UniProtKB/Swiss-Prot annotation:
Pfam families assigned: Ribosomal_L32p (PF01783)
The protein's name in its UniProt record: Large ribosomal subunit protein bL32
Cofactor or coenzyme needed: Zn(2+)
GO molecular function per UniProt: rRNA binding; structural constituent of ribosome; zinc ion binding
Name of encoding gene: rpmF
Amino acid sequence: MAKHPVPKKKTSKSKRDMRRSHHALTAPNLTECPQCHGKKLSHHICPNCGYYDGRQVLAV
């Protein structure tokens, strides 16, 4: 039967939490659409009105 590698020492809470310190989620950067004043992502087409950079790109 094959032997599997196992941890020699228990990982402390401090080491475990330090490893996970970069796992946090970031909130999306929402801006106001200048056409319909709805919320939209920066550098993306507005999902409410379909405008981008002052012109209609998507028929909504």
